Amino acid sequence: MAELGKIEKPEASSFKSKRKFYVIPTLPFEELALEFHIDNAKIERFWGEVREKISYFVSTYGNTSFVYVEGIEESEKAGIEYFEKFGKDSNHYKLIKTLADSGATIKGIDKNESLKFSKLLFEEYSKSFLPEIKELHQDFFGKDIDFDKWREYLVKRIQETQDEMNKYTSKIINELPDNSNGVLIITEGRPVDYPQGMDVFMIRPPAFDEIAKNIRDIQGR
């Protein structure tokens, strides 16, 4: 898997007949912007750099057939209007619109029930560290309640749920037709098994690390 910060022109002949997949690891920057005081200019720079890289690959290998998006139900018919929430002048929106206008189909990779359950598990795990939650549980269940065991159980269920989501997503990705290209927008760190024989390019421009550091610094205060 190639990780692209700077673009170095690959030998097109070595990739010509394979399926090509451009993976964009991201975080919900737009949603986190207010909470973590993320400058919108940094978000725009991130998506602008992504647009440049995708544009390069399109010019080298041809148009993209599918744009796979995390957070959209697999059976849902999603259009460009889904991305209007980011603003029509945003690089995020312009990236998707350019791909869609060139014939790419926007496709979800998740099941709603899996997304909801995964979110519930993560929230429950995070809350288990709050003293107020521990006290509330002890008031009802007694002082002997074992929060470490509870967290171990939650971690186990989180892993099981992620494994199920991984298999489901990998199955959808594997349906990408031969000799075609796809884009995947997915949360950084989410596991995905890519099919053998597929050329996978990880697009992670410098702006990503800058924003991620911004978030970590604020969380560590």
Predicted regions and their residues:
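Compositional signal for N-terminal targeting/processing segments
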Residues: 1-221
